[in-house]
């Protein structure tokens, strides 16, 4: 336990919070070929691989994911939410933050209904998150 004098000389440092989605906090200056600090809510990227992954221990499924090269040249794994998708290699997608708890190494989500990604077909409830238009009935 420090004395009051020690705390006066060198006060306690508060922990700095690390970002949950660090690739969205980097920009890339292609003219200078260097990274800059540039926070953004989403980033555009190109799919380099689309596949399935099995989740961690108590769960069992084939979760869809895509390896995406972002506009700042960082490659990340992003989860494809919803049932069915139209993504393939070279598809242009919009990536947002948000991890998938049972997939190790997946810290990003692909935004459905933006750029080359279609919305989920036949979805009636909770359409906003899945890029589905209102049905005409």
UniProtKB/Swiss-Prot annotation:
Q: Which UniProt keywords apply?
A: Methylation, Ribonucleoprotein, Ribosomal protein, RNA-binding, rRNA-binding, tRNA-binding
Q: Name one GO molecular function term.
A: structural constituent of ribosome
Keyword hit for RNA-binding: yes
A GO cellular component entry from the record: small ribosomal subunit
Modified-residue entries (3-methylthioaspartic acid), positions: 102
Q: Which InterPro entries match?
A: NA-bd_OB-fold, Ribosomal_uS12, Ribosomal_uS12_bac
Which residue ranges are recorded for the region named Disordered?
1-55, 118-137
Q: Does the keyword RNA-binding apply?
A: yes
**Family membership noted in the UniProt record:** Belongs to the universal ribosomal protein uS12 family.
> What function does this protein fulfil?
With S4 and S5 plays an important role in translational accuracy. Interacts with and stabilizes bases of the 16S rRNA that are involved in tRNA selection in the A site and with the mRNA backbone. Located at the interface of the 30S and 50S subunits, it traverses the body of the 30S subunit contacting proteins on the other side and probably holding the rRNA structure together. The combined cluster of proteins S8, S12 and S17 appears to hold together the shoulder and platform of the 30S subunit.
How would you summarize the oligomeric state and partners of this protein?
Answer: Part of the 30S ribosomal subunit. Contacts proteins S8 and S17. May interact with IF1 in the 30S initiation complex.
The molecule here is called: Small ribosomal subunit protein uS12
Origin species, per record, is Staphylococcus epidermidis (strain ATCC 35984 / DSM 28319 / BCRC 17069 / CCUG 31568 / BM 3577 / RP62A)
Taxonomy of the source species: Bacteria, Bacillati, Bacillota, Bacilli, Bacillales
